[in-house]
Amino acid sequence: SNDVENAVWHYLCVSKIDGVKAAEKQFIKITSDRRVPLKEIHALFAEGTERQVLDAIKAGDPGPAALARNQFYGHLYLGLYFEAQGNAIKAADYIAKAAKGHEAHGYMGQVARVHHEWLQQKVKNKEVKPEK
């Protein structure tokens, strides 16, 4: 497959069952997904950086629609990445950003919305402490 999202969801599933180290060992290499910022998201899960994803979101001076799409996918996958890494506060922050404009992003927008609601419930139940 040449779809970064397939590789990322595989990573997320493996990390939930067998841990992050196992997910890293089994991470699927993708070389030709050209969607912004998916290349950088793939790199993030393969030991890249948050900054690479954030920079890619704005690279090339995208128009408003492209910027909104880039921000949505960047924030969604940054949130899921940080959740897998055990950083619940950063995860919740990025997922909340992705969920804000969920209506414009179809199925994946609904994923962001539902995940945000789930994380809010965890905060309410004091399973995750909100950022101060």
Language-model segment annotations:
Residues S1, T31-R34, F45, G60, ...:
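Alpha-helical junction/boundary sensor with strong preference for TPR arrays
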Residues D3-E5, P64, Q71, G109:
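Residues that mark the junctions of alpha-helical repeat units in TPR/alpha-solenoid scaffolds
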Residues A7-W9, V14, P37, H75, ...:
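TPR repeat positional signature
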Residues V20-R34, Q52-P64, A92-A96, K126-K132:
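Alpha-helical repeat scaffolds
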Residues R69-L80:
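Alpha-helical tetratricopeptide repeat
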